[in-house]
Amino acid sequence: MRAAILTLSDKGARGEREDLSGPALSDWLIQQGVVVECMSLIPDDFEQIVSTLEKWIDSLAPDLILTTGGTGVSPRDITPEATGKVIDRELPGFAERMRQESLKKTPHAIISRAIAGIRHRTLIINLPGSPKGAIENLEAVWPAIPHAIAKIQGDPSDCSPL
């Protein structure tokens, strides 16, 4: 599996805050045997998010793109809207599962607006901006990711044997 990680943070992009989530996600993915092909940190800018996601999908064609940051309700949190413009099909079960698991840890999880979806043959998942939240959310949906990617890429086998 090949992945890319996009961190969204105005403060990080200005050099005012170190990106801890992107590297934490990269380390976690590598431990799972995933090849992390690309990592980037950009500001919470709608057009820049859209163009980065589209460029990566068109040029790198990763199996998985994880975004981290910009999923809350602050005025500059626009990652779900930008992702929504990029995806062809939404996969609401990923966000539902992440919120379900996160609510066991914090009542603030209810304000997450993270989404997941497909563009071409790439799965895109929005994760929270904190390293802890990003990893916990990824762990919540990880069991479904390899199967989802196989199906997205055309695996004809049945989903569950009879």
Question: Model regions: which residues?
Answer:
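Non-catalytic beta/alpha edge segments that cap or flank active sites
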Residues: M1-L162
